[in-house]
């Protein structure tokens, strides 16, 4: 590929630059070695001051900062950064992806750019693939940063907002891509500034960047709330699906993960349901249930794509083999699988906020990443993220022996050969790591090894609890570890055992922690580490003599990167190692991409099933199949980004407006423009056609009366001579502005002397904006679902989506203005300690008001209903690590409660949808387990408007345009609803 060649053309130049930086660091290393601990720590303050004064940039400080980190790591971890690690750190600081092979110390490399960029005081995010690695790296690498005087935070899924905010206030924050992304979305659902947790997007170092930005990029992050209850149709179609015959009643394309019903199938479904036409408009929703039930039957396999535990369907990550606890497929797919497995069917969801990982990480001012396998995707990194890929040389030459693939005719013959190979290696003491592609196959191989009498460990989605321990011991003499793809990343496999892991385990047993007891931990670390090194030294030599770690792959993955990750477990840091893949013509990759030609050759040559072949034809077929799948997946990711770019522009506008409101911007002038624009829309719409005497001004005045208390009379038909739209508009706009001024005077001022109207404007605009945005997300989802059909009309679906999406966005913005104006004029307001004011009001539902002094939230955005949640938050805040500074909270809002906009406790929690599985099936959802989340669901209820609640003080008063209950025949607003009349009667 031409682009690949162009991208690699500058490798030599950048490597020479990085090598020169490493040499600069080496030249000043002795200067830092001679410093005391206090003097070394004091360098951080000096660096910060030099940056703050603007005398030097971070680039200027790089050699000194890197030298300081190298020395701190030597004193705390007993590890000195190699020159190639210095080069990797510099590549990251310059905004590149550093490709560093397994075992080259990528985690240690991250300390260099993290420290340097933290000196600017804007925060640094270290992004990992799972919570275990985030916690581990925050503890271990955090020792270096804390030694140098920086604060280190870590984000956990169940962390309450006050603690979460404090973690983000640290100089360096560790967490997963999902947590960072969800916090961004939650911040843009917050109702007040003191709920915000993030403080911007300055610099991010993404560990395993290919996994996060490539593998997981097809599926967006989604926060959703409960929608409609599950229907009987899931169960009904789960009953019908087994009655339909594959290739007769429906067709399946496994490569594209699609199903298509045939005419025969349609007839059978119609007979089973007792309907005449499945495709009548009234039956349209049934087609979705049918497709999902067929996908659940054919494309989602138990113990491969998911497992069933305790009556719950749990998704298994395709790339790592881990169980994705709490996550669910969306678009009804998970419910279809639940119906198939005859377990409880849970609720569907409605989107509240969403963003793709591509667009989230493009928010950062500077982005970088690390991985062992990036060059195969260099073009994609460049096109989508504007990131260069820099291959960093290994510290020691790679001496791993990569054996050619062997191919068997059947899967049974392949596994028989695998068992024999493992048994031979185990007998001579060579450790073996076996990679499988599914839980089902790992358990099958485990049974075969047990029959053969080979002791082994199994690491898959059902046995993930001991993952770190199993992998850390996978390099010991004679160890056999059968693992799904989850073994590809995380803990290092060292020959003879991992001394650091052993030392950490010993200190944990002694009750020592680098966070809770840092001084005692540091004092005991070196002794524990040296003891562990001595214990594994002899065993290391025995394993090297046996040939090092042997990596055996039982199947090729559709991505070359996943295969390379498995191979990369062997041969780290110049160790001996060997790798080989055993394949069969029944493997998924071969089966999906035409292995019939190879099978025909083997049949013609009468090759026995237990005799392998090594053929260039097979090698080319595998490479071609993998390239084809990678190309398809790249196109899917590009397509996702193109469509999300439309939403991204709209999301940026909405979120910027929200942030202005939360930051306390004065909305008064903006709301006045809302009033003028809304009135103009009403007037011009009513006067667009015909002569003035033909205008239906009665209807116009009725509409205006529902918007605000109109103070001018509509011109009679006889008085319209010379009347123009502009003249009429000028009169009505002036009247509306006067009414708005009166409304502000009626509300008065708060305890702080500010007009109550300012706080009301903020709350109403925020509530309306959120509700309209949620409705817009639903409509955009609906638009995108069917937009592909435009291609049948010779129209570009993307162009149509962009055009109609823009029109819908404009309509939404006009709707925000109109509804905000209507509510500002008509909603009831209660001031803490006062009676409800008697301004004209719509008959809105009133929820119980929160206690005085509490921040009022919109109906659709309220705290989760948790027992003693406030006390939990306070307790969690008290548990904040001592070195983490408490983030200042903005001042509380005035105690103003807007009736109809008060908080309501949702009946169900939020759901967080994140990537990690095959995007062809739709996203998966993380169920909120009741975490102290800063926001909550209930969007489906909000979209339907205020519901229920106590109507005291509101329902007793008729709507303004309803007939007056006195029987006069006049509208309420012109009779007993007239403020002037009420005041006169009161006198």
Curated annotation (Swiss-Prot):
EC number(s) stated in the UniProt entry for this protein: 7.4.2.8
Membrane topology: Peripheral membrane protein
Bias type Pro residues, positions: 882-894
Domain of life of the source: Bacteria
Feature: compositional bias, Basic and acidic residues: 975-987
PANTHER family tied to this protein: CHLOROPLAST PROTEIN-TRANSPORTING ATPASE, SECA INNER MEMBRANE COMPONENT OF SEC PROTEIN SECRETION SYSTEM
HAMAP family: SecA
Protein name as it appears in the record: Protein translocase subunit SecA
Organism: Frankia alni (strain DSM 45986 / CECT 9034 / ACN14a)
Gene: secA
């Amino acid at each position: 590929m031409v682009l690949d060649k162009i991208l690699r053309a500058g490798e030599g130049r950048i490597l020479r630059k990085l090598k020169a930086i490493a040499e600069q660091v080496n030249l000043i290393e002795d200067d830092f070695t001679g410093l005391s601990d206090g003097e070394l720590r004091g360098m951080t303050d000096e660096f910060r001051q030099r940056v703050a004064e603007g005398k030097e940039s971070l680039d200027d400080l790089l050699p000194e900062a890197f030298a300081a980190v190298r020395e701190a790591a030597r004193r705390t971890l007993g590890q000195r950064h190699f020159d190639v690690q210095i080069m990797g750190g510099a590549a990251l600081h310059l905004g590149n992806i550093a490709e560093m092979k397994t075992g080259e110390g990528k985690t240690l490399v991250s300390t260099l750019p993290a420290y340097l960029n933290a000196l600017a005081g804007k925060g640094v995010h270290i992004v990992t693939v799972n919570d275990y690695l985030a916690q581990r790296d925050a503890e271990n690498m955090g020792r270096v940063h804390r030694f140098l005087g920086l604060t280190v935070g870590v984000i956990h899924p169940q962390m309450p907002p006050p603690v979460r905010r404090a973690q983000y206030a640290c100089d360096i924050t560790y967490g997963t891509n999902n947590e960072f992304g969800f916090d961004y979305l939650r911040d843009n659902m917050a109702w007040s500034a003191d709920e915000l947790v993030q403080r911007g997007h300055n610099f991010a170092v993404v560990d395993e960047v290919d996994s996060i930005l490539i593998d997981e990029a097809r599926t967006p992050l989604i926060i959703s709330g409960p929608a409609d209850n599950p229907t009987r149709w899931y169960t009904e179609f789960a009953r019908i699906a087994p009655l339909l015959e594959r290739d007769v009643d429906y067709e399946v394309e496994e490569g594209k993960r699609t199903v298509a019903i045939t005419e025969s199938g349609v007839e059978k479904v119609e007979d089973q349901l007792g309907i005449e036409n499945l495709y009548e408009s009234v039956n349209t929703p049934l087609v979705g249930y049918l497709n999902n039930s067929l996908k659940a039957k054919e494309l989602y396999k138990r113990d491969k794509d998911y497992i069933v535990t305790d009556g719950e369907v749990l998704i298994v990550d395709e790339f790592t083999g881990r169980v994705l606890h709490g996550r669910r497929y969306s678009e009804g797919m998970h419910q279809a699988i639940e119906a198939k497995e005859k377990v409880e069917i849970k609720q569907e969801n409605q989107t509240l906020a969403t963003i793709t990982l591509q667009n989230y990480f493009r928010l950062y001012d500077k982005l970088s990443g690390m991985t062992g396998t990036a060059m195969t995707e260099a073009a994609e990194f460049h096109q989508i993220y504007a990131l260069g890929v820099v291959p960093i040389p290994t510290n020691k030459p790679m001496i791993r022996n990569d054996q050619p693939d062997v191919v068997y005719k059947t899967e049974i013959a392949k596994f028989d050969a695998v068992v024999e190979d493992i048994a031979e290696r185990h007998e001579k003491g060579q450790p073996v790591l076996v990679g499988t592609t599914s839980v089902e196959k790992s358990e099958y191989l485990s049974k075969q090894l047990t029959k053969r009498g080979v002791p082994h460990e199994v690491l898959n989605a059902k046995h993930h609890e001991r993952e770190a321990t199993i992998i850390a011991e996978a390099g010991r003499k004679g160890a056999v570890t059968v693992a799904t793809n989850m073994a590809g990343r995380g803990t290092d496999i060292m020959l003879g055992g991992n001394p650091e892991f052993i030392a950490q385990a010993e200190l944990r047993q002694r009750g020592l922690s680098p966070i809770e007891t840092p001084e005692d931990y540091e004092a005991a670390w070196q002794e524990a580490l040296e003891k562990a090194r001595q214990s594994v030294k002899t065993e290391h030599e025995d394993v090297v003599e046996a040939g090092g770690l042997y990596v055996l792959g039982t199947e090729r993955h559709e991505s070359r990167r996943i295969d390379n990750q498995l191979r990369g477990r062997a041969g780290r840091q110049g160790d001996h190692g060997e790798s080989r893949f055993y394949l069969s013509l029944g493997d998924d990759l071969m089966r999906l991409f035409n292995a019939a030609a190879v099978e025909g050759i083997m049949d013609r040559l009468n090759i026995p099933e237990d005799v392998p072949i090594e053929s260039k034809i097979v090698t080319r077929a595998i490479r071609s199949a993998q390239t084809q799948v990678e190309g398809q997946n790249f196109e899917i990711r590009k397509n996702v980004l193109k469509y999300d770019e439309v939403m991204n522009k709209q999301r940026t506008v909405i979120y910027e407006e929200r942030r202005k409101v939360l930051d306390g911007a004065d909305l008064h002038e903006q709301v006045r423009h809302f009033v003028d624009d809304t009135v103009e829309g009403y007037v011009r719409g009513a006067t667009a056609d015909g002569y003035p005497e033909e205008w239906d001004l009665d209807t116009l005045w009725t509409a205006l009366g529902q918007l605000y208390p109109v103070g001018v009379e509509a011109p009679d038909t006889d008085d319209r001579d010379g009347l123009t739209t502009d003249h009429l508009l000028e009169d009505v706009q002036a009247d509306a502005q006067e009414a708005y001024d009166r409304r502000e005077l009626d509300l008065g001022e708060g305890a702080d002397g500010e007009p109550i109207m300012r706080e009301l404007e903020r709350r109403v605009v925020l509530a309306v904006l959120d509700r309209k945005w949620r409705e817009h997300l639903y409509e955009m989802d609906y638009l995108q679902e069917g937009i592909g059909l435009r291609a049948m009309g010779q129209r570009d679906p993307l162009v149509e989506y962009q055009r109609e999406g823009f029109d819908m966005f404009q309509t939404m913005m006009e709707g925000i203005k109109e509804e905000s104006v209507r509510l500002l004029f008509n909603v009831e307001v209660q001031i803490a300690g006062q009676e409800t004011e008697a301004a004209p009001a719509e008959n809105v539902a009133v929820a119980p008001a929160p206690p005085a002094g509490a921040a009022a939230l919109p109906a659709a955005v309220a705290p989760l209903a948790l027992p003693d949640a406030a006390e939990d938050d306070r307790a969690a805040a008290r548990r904040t690590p001592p070195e983490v500074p408490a983030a200042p909270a903005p001042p509380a809002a005035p105690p103003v409660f807007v009736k109809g906009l008060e908080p309501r406790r949702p009946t169900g929690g939020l759901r967080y949808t994140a990537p990690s599985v095959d995007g062809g099936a739709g996203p998966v959802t993380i169920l909120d387990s009741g975490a102290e989340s800063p926001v909550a669901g209930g969007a489906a209820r909000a979209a339907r408007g205020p519901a229920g609640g106590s109507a005291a003080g509101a329902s007793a008063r008729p709507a303004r345009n309803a007939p007056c209950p006195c029987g006069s025949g006049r509208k309420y607003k012109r009779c007993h609803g007239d403020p002037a009349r009420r005041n006169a009667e009161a006198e």
